[in-house]
């Protein structure tokens, strides 16, 4: 299940946008071979709120585009499909029958700024950032160059399969 919580008032959150982002989340989970029913929360905020969360959780006092809060730990250089395809999770990882993957916090204000900066649509930027964040929930990272190349390649591959291009 995908929970969407709009905690900002600078942008209208349309049903079209939420439906598209739900489709992106579901598609990425399927492509990454997540078989369990899952729970992902997607929270929309503005730059001020994401700056506060970023400072509180990471000690970085500036706004960012998206933050990911995975509930599952991953061994170094491993992602969900490398480790957990046949894994039996403890019941503490579930809400009812759904595996809790984690939370995504997305600044719609920063999303809009970046869509202008990168000269593509707001929807394309939101889809990219949500794809990026779901991959973080599944263990992908970009701290090292090799990890970054793997993650960026996977992002582009997934967005391509969804026909979400930089021209979108």
UniProtKB/Swiss-Prot annotation:
This is Endoribonuclease YbeY. One of its GO terms (biological process) is rRNA processing. It comes from Clostridium perfringens (strain 13 / Type A). Its cofactor is Zn(2+). Belongs to the endoribonuclease YbeY family. Keywords: Cytoplasm, Endonuclease, Hydrolase, Metal-binding, Nuclease, Ribosome biogenesis, rRNA processing, Zinc. Coiled coil: none annotated. It is found in: Cytoplasm. It comes from the Bacteria. Its EC number is 3.1.-.-. GO terms for molecular function: metalloendopeptidase activity; RNA endonuclease activity; zinc ion binding. Zn(2+) binds at residues 132, 136, 142. One of its GO terms (cellular component) is cytoplasm. Binds 1 zinc ion. Single strand-specific metallo-endoribonuclease involved in late-stage 70S ribosome quality control and in maturation of the 3' terminus of the 16S rRNA.
């Amino acid at each position: 299940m995908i929970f969407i919580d709009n905690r900002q008032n600078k942008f209208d959150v349309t049903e079209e946008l939420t439906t598209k982002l739900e489709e992106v989340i579901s598609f990425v989970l399927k492509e990454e071979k997540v078989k369990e029913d899952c729970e992902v929360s997607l929270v929309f905020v503005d730059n001020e709120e994401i700056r506060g969360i970023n400072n509180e959780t990471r000690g970085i006092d500036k706004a960012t585009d998206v933050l990911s809060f995975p509930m599952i730990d991953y061994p170094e250089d491993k992602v969900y499909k490398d480790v957990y395809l046949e894994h039996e999770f403890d019941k503490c990882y579930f809400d009812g029958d759904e595996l809790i993957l984690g939370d995504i916090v997305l600044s719609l204000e920063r999303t809009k700024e970046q869509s202008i900066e990168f000269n593509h649509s707001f929807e394309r930027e939101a889809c990219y950032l949500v794809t990026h964040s779901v991959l973080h929930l599944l263990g992908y990272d970009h701290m090292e160059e090799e990890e970054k190349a793997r993650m960026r390649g996977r992002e582009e591959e997934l967005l391509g399969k969804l026909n979400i291009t930089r021209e979108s």
